């Protein structure tokens, strides 16, 4: 299309056209003259289309109003007056992404879809939601999504509840999440960044309906919006839709959403704060020490790229000198770093975990001395080049897993566009990359360290210490505050709250009118592709080993996976497999120090790692096939270097350095402890699944069992180190053996021969010894564990294995997941219960579970699970609703996959003996699912719930109150 700059198209003035060679796209920058909206269209042939509308939202308090408005806009609007159009879209659209996100200074509403009609429908619902939300006239929406007083009768105590209120109680229970917020708030104390945009639970109840509406009125106007379009679409039709349906209804106004720049500090500050741990939890060596710096502005792209490189070189690489200096000084168990350039004034953080407050002076000295030494003597050239290569590989690969590329580009480009900079500058990286490479030659990196780290007074040291009294004090303060509030109320006031609570619950339980539901656009079953995508796979035999070939265009990159059979490893050595996973490739070898090895890996590859993975055979609940997996990604031309490095690691790794092994073990323990509160739901699900099948029991050696193992390993280090030497000497030759080796290669067809010629020498020198398979008697055991942490919310899981109960897997169970997650569990656990989320899974191996996330309840949630069968027996919806559930289910299984994920899916299916015919059968069953099929699953769910297998992680009060449902209760940290 031949468009001209300065011309008007559908009410939009075209200000600039540019080509972005890095992502093979054309960029069109528009301005809507009547409303003042800014629009950027990134045109290319990607069928995974993305739309978003972003508002610059700058909070002025800690009430979380930006976050609560983000939730609430999607709770009904002018054209779509159902209670939750968002949920209806998730149930029944072919979206590849659908969400909304609150950042410290912006709120983003992105959607993505490969279906053109679906894409337009999603845009329509989202635009109506942000500009005409029912939250402005329906106070129950703030009550549900934000907060409300809750009381059932006059004599009951007053309480707070609300989705965001409980979400943030969970978010701020995690020490790393709390640390991140404290760093930001204290580095920019005179700007909008001093406030918690997500909301502080202490302040959330200060938010009134008037403040809520005022925030929306102030910021949710086209003149304060940034509209983004990406992919293969009809530009004129889309612009016309935006103009006629929405933007032309608004007149341009002046909106003050500017972000003040923090005046630099005249001297570095020292800040002390505390975070909660569970009563009775050990607090020794659990302090965080951090040095935090303000770095330029995000508009200075070259500096932003340079600090991405510096973070890797100084703190992330195994060869990072600052990281290693801090570890060797014995200042803590792990070093963490962060460079956040998603705000106007980016921040760079150096963090030691597992420390003590009295080590802060030594911490400061080690950081300063090490950085001075680096400036004086220069950054090691190989380390710097390796770090630049690591960043460049990621930029060129642009593999964002299951997230649409267009979405990640959108988030990245806001780092300039939101602050009135060039809208596309973060998509053009070639020139900046050249500049950064030149800086490496000129000593500019050392100058950046001097200017922004050593001489920078706009910085602070933040000490975050554990305190077991925090939760008790917070709970007492809250109880006292609510008791005083209730005491100050008249009987009429209390009765009004009871009535308001009842009115809210009635609204939450009410069913949307059929005519309102029908206003939300819905595709037809005919719009869905009937055939599932075929697995891309072919078998070869190379050097007496099986090779799986996945011919996929990878743009010159090879994704390599080598799966070594470890079914020969004895039960008593399984812990050492997971220990080896943590250590191998991170220690010295015969020809490399561990630092030199890290540099070589980063210089020649896009990354490599080892991991234990367990597979099962389709339809066999007692099968388990453990593998020790090597994964790497590399430019095809660099394959020989990758294979040389892999050979060095396999045959010449040394595990004899006590210092290095202890450092790695401490990092491993620290990582696990951080993940417990960050991903509590994953921990309870992993533990629960281990009750049911041998495969999950095997995997559990890498979960909580491994945490216990690594703690003991460190507590009795000298003795355990010697045991490790013996175990590694035994298992290494048994692992790296080509008997039953399976290699998976994902690469373009034309590059396959190059890859094989590079890998063949390794396959030829691998030993070919046959070891007997170990038959390990994994007993099925329901442990029913309760785990206590400092969390103020719970993660509640319950499940069973339905195949063991005599049932079979069917595709209808995938539809049941959609119904449960976005109907029954959504209503009862999120909407009525106040939890942030709930989820459900029915797996082909027979394992099923229900789970809740950041949940204020425990026993009540288990009761909801137990009543599922009753809900299913009475399940009765319209044909239109049933179609919606089927479409939403297909959307979930048809997510676009990157080349790496396509190869991984095909090789995993091969191992499990899952055929295209089986996958097609599942799709056929999904498309044919009826209400009768759903009702027929009630007995299966009932039988699973009667197994009464549960696992919960949560706060001490809730877990102890429910102790009768557990066999064991443990303080986990």
Predicted region positions:
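His/Glu-based metal-binding/catalytic segments typifying zinc-dependent metallopeptidases
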Residues: 43-45, 52-54, 165, 169-173, ...
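M16 family metallopeptidases and their MPP-like homologs
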Residues: 48-58, 84-132, 139-150, 177-202, ...
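Active-site His/Glu-centered metal-binding helix of metallohydrolases
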Residues: 65, 69-73, 580
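Hydrophobic, small-residue-rich alpha-helical packing segments that form membrane-like cores
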Residues: 150-224, 228-246, 250-278, 283-285, ...
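Non-catalytic, conformational "gating/processing" segments within enzyme and secreted inhibitor domains
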Residues: 161, 213-245, 703, 724-759, ...
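Extended, regular secondary-structure scaffolds
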Residues: 214, 226, 235-254, 377, ...
